[in-house]
Amino acid sequence: MERKEALFAVFAVGLFVAGVTALAYRTATPGGALDQVAIRHYAFSPGSLTVQVGATVRWVNMDFVGHTVSFGTHEDPTGVESPLLGHMGSFAYTFTEPGTYTYHCDPHPYMTGSVVVAS
């Protein structure tokens, strides 16, 4: 009987992890309630996103390596920067002005993305 219970527990945990992973992999939907960028495989996905003024974008780190979301360029930062995000860590920012916002990962400056904010 203990073996059945153990197998059931493993199965239940597997279903839970699969469900959480599926939710976390949801990416941005223009005009949707949640605009999300996944950080995985040392890249931002989607790499470019268009939202309306007032939209909040959330970045979620799917990698097991720490990443940041740092606005501006590595050489010319703008001051908006997430803390180092661990696995499944997230950072959200609400865009209040139209424009094009570029961002990168400080530890991995080749990782870049942009958010276009339309009025």
Q: Over which residues does each language-model region extend?
A:
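Extracytoplasmic copper-binding redox domains, predominantly the cupredoxin/blue-copper superfamily
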Residues: 2-119
